[in-house]
């Protein structure tokens, strides 16, 4: 069996929408018995009182049960922001009807599959930016893609993907026309990544829209008959050729809970 293509997401979902990080609050150093505090210094607060009020500087515990069992790719660190560059995809009602048909059939093979909440096509891996890098990073992106025009693309090939750690599996629709435009955009995004000493995109990327996902490596169940049957549903769906044709009109960068849009000309 050939290796499944990789997706460029972090393994965590909702937590990436907020600042990543947890920092341990430095403990107060104790004094010798009977030693007076120096002028201007506060007396140390007893531990019994400190434990009544947990430090607000400490980040949340990374509980995978709270985000569908997903495992974080990189650890929380205060001041680090998970960052992703992509083209958003606005799903029409007919697209969601097709998605429902695909998901219903795929769940007969892998019942734990769930639908994606939003749709996009990745132009980068998920990387970590320091907070003070965000605006310079976004400005560099804007400068790099300023000359690009909107373009049409088609996504009508069903494909199974995993993340790098093989902790999540995705059902996606691969780009079958417009691939060269995506490569040109990735080349510019990669140059920005290199300027900030960040990971570039995959060498031979498979541009796609992820439709559904599940925890774990489900390739064995989904490749073969399941994949062929899903492709049949797409091919036979009414007006699927027109339905799965779309325009790339903007590039978006998500960094923590911040979104930056860069319209194409």
From Swiss-Prot:
One GO CC term, this protein: nucleus
Region (Disordered): 1-67
E.C. number: 4.6.1.-
Recorded GO MF terms: 3'-5'-RNA exonuclease activity; lyase activity; poly(U)-specific exoribonuclease activity, producing 3' uridine cyclic phosphate ends
This protein's UniProt keywords: Hydrolase, Lyase, Nuclease, Nucleus
Localisation: Nucleus
Catalytic site positions: 120, 208
Binding-site list for UMP: 164, 202, 206-210
Reaction equations catalysed: a 3'-end uridylyl-uridine-RNA = a 3'-end 2',3'-cyclophospho-uridine-RNA + uridine; a 3'-end uridylyl-adenosine-RNA = a 3'-end 2',3'-cyclophospho-uridine-RNA + adenosine
The protein's enzyme class: lyase
Binding sites annotated in the UniProt record for AMP: 120-122, 202, 204-210
Ranges of compositional bias, category Basic and acidic residues: 20-32
One BP term from GO: snRNA 3'-end processing
InterPro entries in alphabetical order: Cyclic_Pdiesterase, Usb1
HAMAP family: USB1 (MF_03040)
Quaternary structure and partners: Interacts with PLRG1, CDC5L and PRPF19.
Stated role: 3'-5' RNA exonuclease that trims the 3' end of oligo(U) and oligo(A) tracts of the pre-U6 small nuclear RNA (snRNA) molecule, leading to the formation of a mature U6 snRNA 3' end-terminated with a 2',3'-cyclic phosphate. Participates in the U6 snRNA 3' end processing that prevents U6 snRNA degradation. In addition also removes uridines from the 3' end of U6atac snRNA and possibly the vault RNA VTRNA1-1.
Record family assignment: Belongs to the 2H phosphoesterase superfamily. USB1 family.
UniProt protein name: U6 snRNA phosphodiesterase 1
Organism of origin: Bos taurus (Bovine)
């Amino acid at each position: 069996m050939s290796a499944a293509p990789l997706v460029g997401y972090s393994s965590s979902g909702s937590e990436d929408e907020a600042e990543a990080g947890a920092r341990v609050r430095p403990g107060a150093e104790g004094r010798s018995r009977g030693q007076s505090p120096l002028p201007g210094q506060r007396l140390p607060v007893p531990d019994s009182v400190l434990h009544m009020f947990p430090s607000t500087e400490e980040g949340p515990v990374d509980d995978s049960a709270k985000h569908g069992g997903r495992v974080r790719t990189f650890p929380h660190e205060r001041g680090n922001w998970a960052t992703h560059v992509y083209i958003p995809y606005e799903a029409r009602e007919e697209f969601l009807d097709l998605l429902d048909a695909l998901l219903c059939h795929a769940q007969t093979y892998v019942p734990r599959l769930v639908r994606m909440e939003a749709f996009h096509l990745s132009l980068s891996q998920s990387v970590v930016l320091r907070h003070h890098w965000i605006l310079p990073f976004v400005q560099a992106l804007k400068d790099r893609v300023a000359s690009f025009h909107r373009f049409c693309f088609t996504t009508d090939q069903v494909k199974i993907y995993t993340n790098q750690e093989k902790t999540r599996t995705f059902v996606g629709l691969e780009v079958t026309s417009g691939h060269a435009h995506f490569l040109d955009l990735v080349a510019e995004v990669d140059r920005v990544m290199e300027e900030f000493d960040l990971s570039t995109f995959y060498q031979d990327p498979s541009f796609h829209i992820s439709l559904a996902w599940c925890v774990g490596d489900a390739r064995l169940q989904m490749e073969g008959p399941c994949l062929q049957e899903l492709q049949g549903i797409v091919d036979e769906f009414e007006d699927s050729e027109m339905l799965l044709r779309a325009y790339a009109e903007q590039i978006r960068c998500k960094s923590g809970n911040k979104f930056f849009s860069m319209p194409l000309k």
